[in-house]
């Protein structure tokens, strides 16, 4: 395999799909050497097959707004690969949603799910719809319309969607209700459900908790004392909220959150129940701003239109969206003495930023490893649904802690390069090898 030849082919077949092509190139560069050591991969056309989704569904989603006007959005479901288990991945409702973004997310999801060691394939879906500014009734009508088309292509052993940006417990509940009505079954077809009807303990916190567990393992592996360190995070939703809680519990001081309007710096730390509650209130307000934080905690400062990466801290964890941390941000963090960056959003760093961290031997881990706690907890929810059991917080947290430790160990095994651990390479190779071997064993299909 030659990466450039594959990329030239993909660029010709999928012009304009920049996010998807970026994700594929990162993986191919990491796995090229090990791929060429396995002639059975070449014989079975693994690369040519693994970079194309099994199937893609595109459909219109008509719904009626509160003024009685018919609105139409575009819905998608990308079923990328089910070699190791049923398709599994979230649904995103955001105006930016397009096929390139969902293919990139589905491609990443395939390897992320492989890292968890749970039997889950990769998929992703969504629509170019924003719940922000919509009434409760409008959101319900949209979710129900979306599911009337999606339901026939999903199922507990086929494809199990979950939440993502713009899709929380409320939206999952509305979609599950319509699925249940259409399919006439109450099964674990969606995860991220409310606890009252089949959801798992710790699901809202799991991505953030898992990310901090991964950072904890990175620190232990590399001889870094994390207690007392300062941490800059972006975002203010579920992921950032989970990170702030677990980091505080482990003695790490979170000092920033951010939104589309800018970022907040709190020198006292975002580390009390009142401040965690404030993060949830900011999210639930629907205003998509963080500036109101300083009204409740006046010792904090708000920096309009800026990113939190300019602050001098020890660790950084982007928790908002893809490509939010660019090369200039990476250089600023390095200059300010940041020693560890954990990509907590999906592909939160541009390719140039990721390459800069690795080139400068900084401790840097990619999203497919760091944020796998969310889908891991979804897998645990699937298990509980299938067994008709409910686990306690402690049981779920124990599993989550173990899974994140296992993911870290896989990254170290495949990413160790002398005294340095290339977590990007390690995560990509570990996930790729599991999927590729499963595809070889199952034949060309």
From Swiss-Prot:
Keyword line: NAD, Oxidoreductase
Gene Ontology MF terms in the entry: glutamate dehydrogenase (NAD+) activity; glutamate dehydrogenase (NADP+) activity
Active-site feature positions: 124
Cellular component GO terms, alphabetical: cell surface; cytosol
Highest taxon of source: Bacteria
One Pfam family matching this protein: ELFV_dehydrog_N
Residue ranges that the Swiss-Prot or TrEMBL entry lists as coiled coil: none
InterPro entries referenced in this protein's UniProt entry, alphabetically: Aminoacid_DH-like_N_sf, Glu/Leu/Phe/Val/Trp_DH, Glu/Leu/Phe/Val/Trp_DH_C, Glu/Leu/Phe/Val/Trp_DH_dimer, Glu/Leu/Phe/Val_DH_AS, Glu_DH, Glu_Leu_Phe_Val_DH, NAD(P)-bd_dom_sf
A biological-process GO annotation: glutamate biosynthetic process
SUPFAM superfamilies noted in UniProt: Aminoacid dehydrogenase-like, N-terminal domain (SSF53223), NAD(P)-binding Rossmann-fold domains (SSF51735)
Designated name of the protein: NAD-specific glutamate dehydrogenase
């Amino acid at each position: 395999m030659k990466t450039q030849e594959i990329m030239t082919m993909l660029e010709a077949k999928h012009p304009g799909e920049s996010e998807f092509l970026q994700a594929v190139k990162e993986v191919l560069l990491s796995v090229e050497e090990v791929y060429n050591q396995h002639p059975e991969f070449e014989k079975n056309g693994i690369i040519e097959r693994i970079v194309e989704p099994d199937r893609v569904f595109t459909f219109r989603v008509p719904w009626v707004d509160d003024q009685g006007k018919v609105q139409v959005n575009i819905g998608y479901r990308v079923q990328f690969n089910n070699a190791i288990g049923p398709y599994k991945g979230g649904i995103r409702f955001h105006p930016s949603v397009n096929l390139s973004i969902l293919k990139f997310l589905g491609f990443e999801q395939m390897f992320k799910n492989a890292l968890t060691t749970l039997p889950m394939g990769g998929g992703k879906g969504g629509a170019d719809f924003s719940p922000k500014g919509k009434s409760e009734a409008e959101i319900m009508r949209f979710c129900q319309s979306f599911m009337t088309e999606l339901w026939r292509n999903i199922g507990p052993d086929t494809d199990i969607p979950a939440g993502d940006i713009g899709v929380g417990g409320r939206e999952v509940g509305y979609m599950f209700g319509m699925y249940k009505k259409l399919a006439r079954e109450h099964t674990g077809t969606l995860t991220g459900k409310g606890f009252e009807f089949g959801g798992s303990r710790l699901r809202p916190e799991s991505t953030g908790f898992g990310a901090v567990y991964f950072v904890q393992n990175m620190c232990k592996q590399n001889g870094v004392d994390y207690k007392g360190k300062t941490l800059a995070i972006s975002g203010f939703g579920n992921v950032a909220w989970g990170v702030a809680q677990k980091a505080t519990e482990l003695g790490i001081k979170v000092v920033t959150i951010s939104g589309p309007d800018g970022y907040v710096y709190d020198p006292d730390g975002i580390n009390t129940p009142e401040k965690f509650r404030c993060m949830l209130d900011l999210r639930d307000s629907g205003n998509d701003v963080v500036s109101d934080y300083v009204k409740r905690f006046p010792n904090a400062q708000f920096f309009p239109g800026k990113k939190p990466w300019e602050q001098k801290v020890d660790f950084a964890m982007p928790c908002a969206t893809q490509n939010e941390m660019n090369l200039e941000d990476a250089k600023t963090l390095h200059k300010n003495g940041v020693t560890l960056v954990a990509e907590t959003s999906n592909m939160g760093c541009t390719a140039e930023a990721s390459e800069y961290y690795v080139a400068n031997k900084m401790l840097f881990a990619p999203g497919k490893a760091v944020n796998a706690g969310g889908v891991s907890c979804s897998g645990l929810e699937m298990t509980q649904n299938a067994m008709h059991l409910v686990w306690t917080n402690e049981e779920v947290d124990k599993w989550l802690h173990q899974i994140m430790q296992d993911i870290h160990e896989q990254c170290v095994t495949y990413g160790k390069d002398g005294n340095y651990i290339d977590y990007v390479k390690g995560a990509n190779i570990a996930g790729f090898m599991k999927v590729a071997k499963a595809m070889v064993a199952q034949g060309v299909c």
